[in-house]
């Protein structure tokens, strides 16, 4: 077998985890421009932890807490209660993530309930290396997308959809991740990489991407119903 998901060996390492390895991210994953939002006529300032923006729930988002654990016959359920005003968000929110083994599949189900209108966009932040270790830049990737969301230097969308044809974002045909990244190769450990939203083709449940480990031959296929993938 090959361990294809990055992780740490101790709880202490996870508590100092600045890369969100394997974390439940919330209340809202990704960035909120200017670290504020308006809801029901009220303005809510949030913690600025990514320049002037708010990222992955703030300074102490859901990833920085040890959740309560309930053992199930076929898995486990994690729960925590986020109090009103945590990181600037309104409402007391009770969130749960249930992990279940279904045959050869691991299923994650997210639920959240708040006593006030609020924002909620939970995700899992796992990192995959299909070789089981070393650089992943030699992995071959295909993405079924015609455009990416243009972004500012602060990684905030501008609203413009930029065609991928002829750019480094063109993964319409499978290619190594490192092919169009200047100064990188399959042996590199550091790169600016890709941190962009791909606007996926089609609608409904469909293939979004196919990733292949260059040394292991392991293939991961990503399916989604969403319009984009980052």
Q: What spans do the regions from the language model cover?
A:
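An exposed, glycine/acidic-rich loop-and-rim segment of catalytic or binding clefts
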Residues: 1-230
């Amino acid at each position: 077998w090959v361990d294809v998901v990055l992780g740490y060996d101790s709880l202490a390492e996870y508590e100092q985890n600045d890369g969100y390895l394997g974390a439940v991210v919330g209340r809202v994953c990704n960035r909120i421009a200017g670290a504020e939002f308006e809801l029901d006529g009220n303005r809510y300032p949030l913690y600025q932890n990514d320049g002037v923006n708010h990222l992955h729930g703030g300074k102490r988002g859901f990833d920085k807490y040890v959740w309560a654990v309930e053992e199930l016959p076929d898995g486990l359920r994690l729960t925590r209660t986020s109090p009103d005003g945590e990181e600037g968000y309104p409402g007391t929110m009770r969130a749960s993530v249930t992990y279940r083994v279904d045959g050869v599949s691991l299923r994650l189900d997210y639920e959240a309930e708040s006593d006030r209108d609020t924002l909620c966009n939970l995700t899992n932040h796992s990192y995959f290396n299909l070789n089981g270790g070393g650089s992943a830049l030699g992995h071959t990737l295909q993405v079924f997308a015609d455009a990416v969301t243009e972004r500012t230097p602060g990684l905030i969308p501008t609203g413009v959809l930029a065609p991928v044809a002829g750019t480094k974002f063109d993964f319409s045909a499978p290619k190594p991740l490192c092919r169009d990244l200047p100064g990188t190769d399959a042996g590199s450990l550091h790169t600016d990489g890709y941190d962009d939203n791909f606007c996926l083709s089609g609608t409904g449940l469909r293939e979004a991407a196919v990733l292949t480990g260059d040394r292991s031959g392991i293939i991961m296929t990503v399916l989604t119903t969403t319009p984009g993938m980052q």
